[in-house]
């Protein structure tokens, strides 16, 4: 474990994680929570072991991305529910990368479910619980001073890199990466850095053999036991990462 890092004041509790300051101003203490939410947090249910599973999945993915040249905020996983991460100033954007039609894209454009795209589709959503995270385009991002055009361009570049690597990871697991959501922050030097988490909470995953959902849609649509599904994702991921 990083030497002498101590948990201090609670900074923020979100839908899936609680963030704490530490005795190092550059490091945050993240605790993954045993709960699932839907409808932008309006539905919240305790889920046994979910925090532990998501923490381990996210930790393995962040380490893999770093090993493949994609920098991110992950430092280490000192315990089952805790992650130490580099502190960044979060950019209030959710970046969604879509490889096939599903969810809101499918509904909005009446595209057949899981229609594959010739190239990835990138979308931005403005992070605001009050506004229900509305879609936002490049011009609107600039008009609202959310991020500069240069930062948006860098987010897009990194998002496509992440997509390329994640697609390969999940394919090796026998899983189709349909789409996913990621977030970025700025370091003290202004560098754009991948942050937040990558887990079945933020990805849409489909078993290539059975077509079964292996993500939070299991909770959203009451399709089965979320804990066992996330455990299956972790088991496959660990096998791939240890190969």
From Swiss-Prot:
- Spell out the reaction equation it catalyses: 5-amino-1-(5-phospho-D-ribosyl)imidazole-4-carboxylate + L-aspartate + ATP = (2S)-2-[5-amino-1-(5-phospho-beta-D-ribosyl)imidazole-4-carboxamido]succinate + ADP + phosphate + 2 H(+)
Listed GO MF terms = ATP binding; phosphoribosylaminoimidazolesuccinocarboxamide synthase activity
EC code: 6.3.2.6
Under Pfam families, the record lists: SAICAR_synt
What keywords tag this UniProt record?
ATP-binding, Ligase, Nucleotide-binding, Purine biosynthesis
EC category: ligase
In what pathway does it function? Purine metabolism; IMP biosynthesis via de novo pathway; 5-amino-1-(5-phospho-D-ribosyl)imidazole-4-carboxamide from 5-amino-1-(5-phospho-D-ribosyl)imidazole-4-carboxylate: step 1/2
Q: Known InterPro entries for this protein? A: SAICAR_synt/ADE2_N, SAICAR_synt_PurC, SAICAR_synth, SAICAR_synthetase, SAICAR_synthetase_CS
Q: GO biological process annotations for this chain's record?
A: 'de novo' IMP biosynthetic process; cobalamin biosynthetic process
Quote the HAMAP family the UniProt record gives. Answer: SAICAR_synth
The text of the family note is: Belongs to the SAICAR synthetase family.
Q: What's this protein's name?
A: Phosphoribosylaminoimidazole-succinocarboxamide synthase
Q: Which organism is it from?
A: Lactiplantibacillus plantarum (strain ATCC BAA-793 / NCIMB 8826 / WCFS1)
